Amino acid sequence: MSHSTPVYSIMYRRLEKLVELIWLPGTQSMTDDDFKDTLTVFAECGLQHRARRLIIDMREFKHRPGPEVQVFRDEVIMPKYVQAGVEKLAWIWPGESGDWITKSAGGTYYNRYFDTADQALSWLATTQ
């Protein structure tokens, strides 16, 4: 990535076993390769810390990934979440709603959309 404007921030919260990805406004100029690189860094962080919970804040996300990115996410990224031991993934994405279970070779994890970070963190703090 050769951006002068930051495109993301990743934080690890040890006590919560949580890794958080916050997309920043610089995503407007990112490429699909930049997007895939960021997802890889996020997934590797989850693996490194054996994260049980993930949160992705989409409020400032401006990039529109191409269709091949979904294949990459399904085949490369989601198995890393399962390998890390992820149980829940919260999406902060105002206007979206719903929840679902992601099934990948070796495991599953729960997903849910939220309007605010507080709502997402509250859900992540509960047990299944």
Language-model features: where?
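Amphipathic, Lys/Arg-enriched alpha-helical "gate/interface" segment within cytosolic domains
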Residues: M1-Q128
